[in-house]
Amino acid sequence: MPRHPLAREAMGGASVKRKEKRAVTRDALRVTSDEYTEAHAKSGVTADLPEIETWPNQYKGYEITIEIPEYTAICPKTGLPDFGTIRLRYMPDKACLELKSLKLYIHAYRNLGIFYENAVNRILQDVVAACRPVWARVTGEFTARGGLHSTIEAKYP
């Protein structure tokens, strides 16, 4: 008899053949995409966040790398905290990102319900809007959850 209560309930008893038990158990425990709503998918994408300020760039043809090891947000599905490191690389054109405002911007994610993928893409979108770089790349390396380690990367252009 399976140990998981949903599997036992779905089988309706112990008289089911072993081959059928496996199939019913898989179906009983299957996570469907119906459990993730459009609201989950869009969570945090249009949230009001602090403005990222800039200052006038004086040089051309160099790269800036900023590593932010204290990224936190909330998973919109589970409500559990997510942790990670955000790495921003860009080549400035006419403006550079002001670091204090960038720090305040990233810390605003702390209580925001947003998926990893949306966070990385939103950060890139806001960085590009703020400083109009020649190119930019945002990489999010997130702490393992359930044995899975996720790295998300978004690029401009």
Task: Tell where the protein language model's regions lie, with residue ranges.
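N-terminal amphipathic/basic-hydrophobic helices that include classical n-h-c signal peptides
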Residues: M1-S15
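N-terminal intrinsically disordered, cationic/polar leader segments
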Residues: G12, V16-P157
